[in-house]
Amino acid sequence: MQQLQLHDVWEKLRPRDESIELGHYKKALQDVEKVLKKNPTIQCGRALKAWAFLRLGRDEESAALIKALEQETPTESTTLHVMTLCYKETDQLDKICQIFTSASKQLPGNEELLSQLFIAHMRVNDFKAQQTVAMQLYKLKPRNPFYFWAVTSVMLQALRGPDAKDQQKSSLLLSLAQRMVDKLIADNKIEASQEVQLYLQILQHQEKYQEMLTFLDGPVCTNLYPGAPHSIKIDLLKKLNKWADLNKLMKQLLTEDPDRWDYYQDYILSTIEMIKCKDETPETDHTVDMCHEFIAGIIESQPRKNRGPYLARLELARLMVKHKFDKEQQFGELTELLLDYFRMFGDKTCCANDLKLFLEYVEPAKRPGFAAQLMQECRINPVTLPSSKEHMQRHICSLQIARFCGAHAALSEEHLSALYTALSLHYEHGYNTFGQGLLPTDMGPSDPYALLAVNIMYDRAWKLQRSEPLVEALCLLNHLLSNSINNFHGKLLNLQLYHRLGLVEAAHRAYESLDIKHIQLDSLGYLHCSHLCNGGFPALAKQIFDQTLHFFINDTNSVEFLKTSYNFGSFSKLIEFLDFRDRLSNSLHFTLISVEALLLEMVCFSGTLAQNLAAYRLMRIKPQEDRIKWDEMSDNRDLTIFVHWDPTVEQLREECQKDSFSQEHELLQLRSGLLRLVSSFIELFTKGGDDEYQTAQDLSRHWEELFVTVRAKNRQPACERFLVNLLPSRLHSVLAMPYEAVFRDLASFLLALWKGEKHDQIRSGAERCVKHVNDLFELIAGSIKTYNSSGDLLWNRKKVHDTVNACVEIAALVLFVMTVCFDKYSQAPAPQPTRKTKKKDSEQNNHEPAVVLMTEKNRLQLVVDVLRALKTNLVDCEAVLSSWELPLLSDSLAGALEQMSLGAKSESAVRLKLMDTHLGEIKELKKLLKDKLKLINKSI
């Protein structure tokens, strides 16, 4: 009966998701305690109680129960499972190994416990211990899976263990893993294709490519792994420089599948390499003429047009240009071949992307002429429209290539406006003629016209430095998305435009429409999350941060993928899963959002100080520890999500992406430094030990050094010349705002205040803090005043938006720290001023005066001075925020939109989003300031 009751309690405690209400845990705890009253020695019940305590934030009580259970060395599976959950939540994975080691010693020969012990070692990447346990299991039950657990563990020691960087030890371990498998091969005990794949992997890591090739063609691989991908053999032949064999293989594969673009690339590569080494092996195509003849033969023999061989012909021409073959050897101008390709496949949506692959090898001076030829091929002029969907697609392709060749960059503002008008009308015609009756998931065939038009309008706005073209672009996008509700390219441009204008709530709606989930939260979250920080909408930011962190926290259970791989013998996937787990756990985006979420929580603290400190404790911040692996940060951003047709060099784009990652890395350093510095202040004034003082002092010094280092690199914001580009990093906003000075002087004041020795330094520190507070709110008022007097409010909104929100964040963090200081000194007894005395003989000899500490009352008064400055400015700030004018759309703009047939519907939708975002931001900021006022009023 008791076991049944415990099972019921277990089900009640088990979290269905991370957002389970706190009250459920209280009820579960009550149920557990009822059972324990009847039988207080039940280990499972005490484990459940410890877990409930943990979820309720009562960590110390939970730790005491778990420690008592550890000493009893439990062996019952449910108890061990609950203890495992507790250790996972407190990030004590090594303790899981300890309890299962103790349990397996109590019950030697227990397969389940040994298997769980193996998995426990797997969680902490203790590959040596994995090997030991796997061999114990194999001796207990001689099965191939257990043996290959051991083989895999040896391989992982070589690749990812402590000795992985020692070339000699790593080689020895890989040799051991190979010999272990060789033994089974000799005994004819290999049973599965996954075991064969693991052996190939071991050989590959040793770079024994010839052995791999021999084994791949041998009887074991042929029988157990008949479906081995051709790519394995192709890669081996390339690494072994067996170009003739590769050439023969690729000819055979292309004969069977003549539309494989990747096969053509390897086939042409083999021909070029054979030419270089003058290899004329029979039955190979060892000249460009033979290669061209083979490709031409496939083109002539195919019953229908396939892109593969035509792309191959372009690839051959490209490589001949790259390797500087004589013009006599080349098969015509590359531009002529590209033009032929356009004539053949211009009606395909992929044609423009195909042509982009080769345009880099066309001389820049010839590109505009080539683009003009494409336009002529379309036979569309200002008074004609496409006659069919295919005709329209050819026109779209020619326009995209024209932009890529730089044709639009040279246009004047008037020509850009005319081109925008033409593209918008083409979109309307295409939608009305060819875009009816499509499925909701389909993108309209004329949608690319609208996307190009939006880019054109951004170009125009950039030239004019005005917002009206951007509003027109937003209206067109709104119209596009009402027709093609799932056009994610349009949604991405919408998101970009709203963020560039500092309209966070409108950008959030665009982000939500993308329906980003799962791994996309890491790869695409950068599009929005980073700009939510200090975005003026803390509730929205919390929602997105929680959603993102929920994915990453749950993905710590990706260890289950590894467990499944071991259980099902999918050994070849283990390295892939381990790499994937490392990329997620070291994701720059995840780490930055983790830090930002904690800072946001502090900024939004409201209620009583006791409630705030309780919430702070739940964050489990340890300022003395830097838990970020800075050298292992991973850039998981998907930077290919945008389709761009801007005339940028790919090499420059790659350099910009690397620089962007470096800037985000430095932003993370500054934000993490801020979080740890503020936390060190809280620890100092709540615990008040010498260790806490030393930590705060070290972090204060680190804060100053960080800014010196980052400023010395002189990073430049990402270029905003084109719409489809990375948004400028928030690093520049942090450097421009007074973060450095405010928290440097705050640290100096608080450290001196805690010591209480240098009275003048303490008073001057308090005065500097008061001045910083006044300056912050003057900066808010000044930026809003400048904005209100600017001619184009919407164009200048982003700057004032960043300034206001940064200043509010700084003020909120300072306020939280000062309320903690106030609490410390207001509750302290009022002793007489303490005096550090020295021995009389020492005083007589050195004539040094005694050090008189500042009284608690005087310290409290200085803290109150800072809080009063905050209070005064917070009260005044409400009126300042109310004066922040709403950007209004001009009547001429409405008329222009009407002429474009976009109608009032799109214009009113954009106007409403603009108004809601602006007024909503002011409302959210006022609410935040009111919460801060309430917090101050409860203190002073």
From Swiss-Prot:
Keyword Cell wall biogenesis/degradation: no
Repeat (TPR) residue spans along the chain: 77-110
Classification via InterPro entries: NAA25_NatB_aux_su, TPR-like_helical_dom_sf
Primary localization class, coarse: other
Gene Ontology process terms (BP): immune response; innate immune response; phagocytosis, engulfment
Compartment(s): Lysosome
GO cellular component: lysosome; NatB complex
Pfam families listed in its UniProt record: NatB_MDM20 (PF09797)
Keywords, in A-Z order: Antimicrobial, Immunity, Innate immunity, Lysosome, TPR repeat
Subunit relationships: Component of the N-terminal acetyltransferase B (NatB) complex.
Its job: Non-catalytic subunit of the NatB complex which catalyzes acetylation of the N-terminal methionine residues of proteins beginning with Met-Asp or Met-Glu. Has 2 roles in the larval immune response: required both for the phagocytic degradation of internalized bacteria and for the induction of Defensin in the fat body. Within the phagocytic blood cells, has a role in detection of infection and activation of the humoral immune response.
Family: Belongs to the MDM20/NAA25 family.
PANTHER family: N-ALPHA-ACETYLTRANSFERASE 25, NATB AUXILIARY SUBUNIT, N-TERMINAL ACETYLTRANSFERASE-RELATED
Name of the protein in question: Phagocyte signaling-impaired protein
Species name: Aedes aegypti (Yellowfever mosquito)
